[in-house]
């Protein structure tokens, strides 16, 4: 029995809702995607709910579910996964947070992402905060990708029941940090002190002075959320399926998930996780990994960002960009030897500007696949596909079975 290789491609936030300016089509249906459509014709389509029907999923919990883990059991907050993703060496008693560089004016958050500042700017600003802010505990503050950053409070894991200051929409003041016990109260007080001192450093930083002169929103405030401790992973993905697994990822959160479950993670030069990401660099790295790894995970972020930005046209353009990436991969592999699955971690409809509970399009093609009669890759075609509507955690077992790597249950 020939064992095949597996390629899981996640186009972050892929699913959407009908767009009036597209004649009622979704961005995926509107986009020109000859490569994914070719796979749809030779493969099988369906829909998947990353958690359960109608439940909006975070990128962290969605990815954990898709890789076969029960997020209700293993998830311990986003922050720790972000920290793993930026390569920090953490201890089990550390407490980590996801942070946004944001813009504040007269006590009101005017932009939760500070105009989507560049990764280079974020890293320089984070360095200034780390060097100039003093706290009663040891801490690490580093930039991640784009407007994202990570904060780690050393030895404060017992205070994980702390809230956040992120109002989750512009036009509102920052929230006050809530707490549930004495340990989390200590953490809340430290976070308040950190945010205030960081604001003083950021507001007068040369990068923000330059941004103001250019008419760009300054990254002069920090929104902190997602308190997290070490995830409770019962068994590594690589151990469970007895495969060598590699991943091509630019975004720190998803890197953290992949590292936590045993993947070797690669970020080729030019892969930014932003609209300008070099898809050919990611495609070439994916083809390279498929030579040495049994299972490869390729992540693409810009589709999600366009949904959050309520930009249907840009989302369609990013889907087309992803299709070109997929086209390169198809030119350099033998589909008889590889099982490909393409989906999103969740839906990010432009009208919602956030994650929703809408089901996510799913495509599986390659060796061993019994094709259905679908013609293209889109939300409505997926509704009539042969896979039906499944849970996110069913995707990998289906792939592994087609790869001839599953074990029989029973005699």
UniProtKB/Swiss-Prot annotation:
Protein purpose: Catalyzes the interconversion of 2-phosphoglycerate and 3-phosphoglycerate.
The keyword Oxidoreductase belongs to this UniProt entry's keyword annotation: no
InterPro entries: Alkaline_phosphatase_core_sf, ApgAM_prokaryotes, Metalloenzyme, Pglycerate_mutase_ApgM, Pglycerate_mutase_ApgM_sf
EC class (word): isomerase
Any single biological process term in GO: glycolytic process
PANTHER family found in the cross-reference section: COFACTOR-INDEPENDENT PHOSPHOGLYCERATE MUTASE, METALLOENZYME DOMAIN-CONTAINING PROTEIN
Species of provenance: Thermococcus kodakarensis (strain ATCC BAA-918 / JCM 12380 / KOD1)
Alphabetized Gene3D superfamilies for the sequence: Alkaline Phosphatase, subunit A, Metalloenzyme domain
One Pfam family cited in the UniProt record for this chain: PhosphMutase
Reaction equations catalysed: (2R)-2-phosphoglycerate = (2R)-3-phosphoglycerate
Protein name: 2,3-bisphosphoglycerate-independent phosphoglycerate mutase
Pathway: Carbohydrate degradation; glycolysis; pyruvate from D-glyceraldehyde 3-phosphate: step 3/5
